Amino acid sequence: MRKIDLAIYDDFVSPSYLEAIQSACDPSSTPWYFQGSQSLTDYDDALIEDFGFSIGILPPWQPDQFDDTPIATLIKPLIYRIKDIAKADHILRCRLDMTVLHDRYLHPPHIDIGQPHVACIVYVNDSDGDTVIYDHKTKWAKEYCDTGNLPIRERIAPKAGRMVLFDGNYLHTGYSPSEHQTRILINTVLS
């Protein structure tokens, strides 16, 4: 796997392909599945606002095996392109994530999995609800330090078609949108 610190690619997804993805995951016509925790492995009553919705593309229990659904078939070429850019051997997980209008909620900081990996975000729609990558690398845990004093490595605004690749050991999080109904992204984990 290529050593990746942090890379941001604007207009990574071509306009017509992006439009097809947006149409395929439009919440007014596509079923989304409730997730009690967007950020953490286990649901926590104390973090009741850390909810969102998802659509599985490639589940973590079957690396490199995409679901046999129309939306997974549509997104698969994009994920293979990302895999090639990252020079990754495996796609460990891929899902669509949607957070909804909220009053400036910052989700809990986290890393996605315990093994060394590259994390990838592709924003599907223009929205607010920045992604925050802290200048702090850590190992996977159920809880993380208070980020109040951690320096921010990068703050990235959700822009349709923008792709962010980063070392998955960076502690990171995101905001729910407070000025748009939805913030939709494709979240992929590679090794």
Predicted regions located by residue number:
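Non-heme Fe(II)/2-oxoglutarate
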Residues: 1-87
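Catalytic core of non-heme Fe(II) oxygenases with the double-stranded beta-helix
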Residues: 68-191
